[in-house]
Amino acid sequence: MTRALYFVLPLALMSQTPHHDPLYKRLQRLYFLSVQSATYLQPFEDTLQILAARYGPYPTIQMYRYGALALKARYATNLLKKKDYLYAAIASMDAQVARTPNDPEVRFLRGSFYYYLPFFLGKRKAAQDDIQTLVTLLETQTQDLTQLYDKEVLRAMADFIAQTGWVEETRVKKLRQRYSL
């Protein structure tokens, strides 16, 4: 009987969403810290590997994997590797958004990455589209999103939306009120 449990448990874990897993919360925090400092990149990647093994190719986990490529591009000193990481991140993120266009975290991750890219890479329109889609999702899926995400994550999304200047101030204010931020 115990042997059967060894096979069922991994399948049961993979069938659930990772959003309520404490390790997923750690992944989110490590990603934001990795954006600010390369010292967090390895712990972020280690956590990402554990979650990928636990949940399989879940869309947001895949997107964080592509975010890791973007971070490697940011911190790489070799220009050829930097270019390779950058273009791999862009292609992978575009493909993930095409597969899951209505996932707010997927849109947030790509939109925040593209926002900081130089204009000559031609990703400004995609970033604006991601932010507008994210706002619409936050406005229309309040109940679902408050169950999936901590206030800290929703606050980061709302703050970033405000920072872009691409969304009317009244909509940003309503978002912050809606999520009690």
Where are these regions (language model features)?
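Terminal, low-structured helical/coil segments at or just beyond the last alpha-helical repeat
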Residues: T140-L181
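N-terminal leader/linker segments that initiate helical-solenoid repeat arrays
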Residues: T17-E45
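Short coil/turn linking the two alpha-helices of tandem helical-hairpin repeats
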Residues: F32-V35, L71-L80, Y116-L121, G165
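Structural register within alpha-helical repeat arrays
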Residues: R65, K72, R110, A156-I161
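Helix-turn-helix repeat elements of alpha-solenoid scaffolds
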Residues: S34-T47, K82-A91, K123, D130-I131
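TPR/TPR-like (Sel1-like) alpha-helical repeat modules
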Residues: D84, I90, G122-T140, R176-L181
